[in-house]
UniProtKB/Swiss-Prot annotation:
Keywords: Amino-acid biosynthesis, Cytoplasm, Dioxygenase, Iron, Metal-binding, Methionine biosynthesis, Nickel, Nucleus, Oxidoreductase
Function, as annotated: Catalyzes 2 different reactions between oxygen and the acireductone 1,2-dihydroxy-3-keto-5-methylthiopentene (DHK-MTPene) depending upon the metal bound in the active site. Fe-containing acireductone dioxygenase (Fe-ARD) produces formate and 2-keto-4-methylthiobutyrate (KMTB), the alpha-ketoacid precursor of methionine in the methionine recycle pathway. Ni-containing acireductone dioxygenase (Ni-ARD) produces methylthiopropionate, carbon monoxide and formate, and does not lie on the methionine recycle pathway.
Disulfide bond residue pairs: none
Enzyme category, top tier: oxidoreductase
UniProt-listed Enzyme Commission number(s): 1.13.11.54, 1.13.11.53
One of the protein's GO biological processes: L-methionine salvage from methylthioadenosine
Protein name in the entry: Acireductone dioxygenase
Entry's family note: Belongs to the acireductone dioxygenase (ARD) family.
Residues at which Ni(2+) binds: 82, 84, 88, 128
Superkingdom of source: Eukaryota
UniProt: Fe(2+) binding residues: 82, 84, 88, 128
Ranges of compositional bias, category Acidic residues: 1-10
Amino acid sequence: MRAYIYDEESQLSPQDEHESSQSVSKQELEKLGVLYWSIDSIDQVNSIAIQRDYKNRDQIICSPQAMGDIYQQKLDTFFEEHLHEDEEIRWVVEGSGYFDVRDQTDQRWVRIKVEKGDLLVLPPGIFHRFTVDKDNYIKAMRLFKDEPKWVALNRSTESESNPYRKAYIEQVGKAMTMGAF
């Protein structure tokens, strides 16, 4: 995993790195409520699933071959800024991609490069987006506390006032009093 401030000036495709010179540490991600583990085996995933009460899982393959004609439509959907009312938990089994999350100012994107073995947990209420990288392939295990579902609430006035969003802002505000990045 590698995290850094997303270079907004770049005119490149969202699937490019958009590398800036500002790196973001694992500790800084934790202040945003984002959790990360480097996982070598399914046994480690199972252990975290038990600790965090993840009862269900499935797998998604995001590639032109796996998704066919709907691939670009799905990429566009995933890259639209949105939040969820549940944690978003992904363990990368193969391939790579980028999760972008809003920083504590809600003005900049923090880009998180994920690759095989990376397990990422995004908290409910955080605005984020996802895309594969230039290799156009990722296979990820999705973990869920309840029944598998993926309900995205795109950024809007309505989603800004969502109770999960408000709870997230309160949580991050408390973490930021301990030192912003």
